[in-house]
Regions:
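Extended beta-strand/beta-hairpin segments
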Residues: 1-48, 59-140
Length: 140
């Protein structure tokens, strides 16, 4: 896996990243750090990637289990250390899984498998942060 990150220049603290799969992402800093607040912060992108990783797992596991999943949202709420390097210390993942006749046990299994076995991003973050997760099922 490869990503190239480039600073956009001396007028701020924005960066563009090109992924190995050919996609572009822009990041920016807070105004108090010289940024213009025009894009997500790099640490927000860590949460974005982690949320995408675990939501992907949950949907895939449910689909493979032939569950009629129609939607999956995950809200990540995180706390960071007060001192540098300001790592994440707590992250809560709350899943809202939408579908028809979804089994509670199947959703719980999918969430647990993602966090315990498959989502490399959340497993890495668990080395420094207390990870908790919850879910709700919405019938459609």
């Amino acid at each position: 896996m490869e990503v190239k990150v480039s600073w956009n220049g001396p007028s701020g603290m924005s960066f563009r990243a090109e992924t190995g799969s050919g996609h572009m992402v822009v990041m920016d800093g807070a105004p108090d750090g010289g940024g213009n607040n025009l894009a997500p912060r790099p640490m927000e992108m860590v949460l974005v990637g982690t949320g995408g990783c675990t939501a992907y797992d949950v949907v895939l596991i449910l689909k493979r289990g032939r569950e009629d999943v129609r939607g999956c949202d995950v809200l990540l709420q995180a706390e960071r250390a007060d001192t540098d390097p300001k790592v994440f210390t707590k992250i809560n993942f709350h899943f809202t899984v939408t579908g028809r006749n979804l089994k509670q046990a199947a959703v719980e299994r999918a969430v647990n498998l993602s966090h315990d076995k498959y989502c490399s991003a959340s497993i890495m973050l668990a080395k420094t942060a207390e990870i908790t997760h919850s879910f709700e099922i919405v019938e459609v």
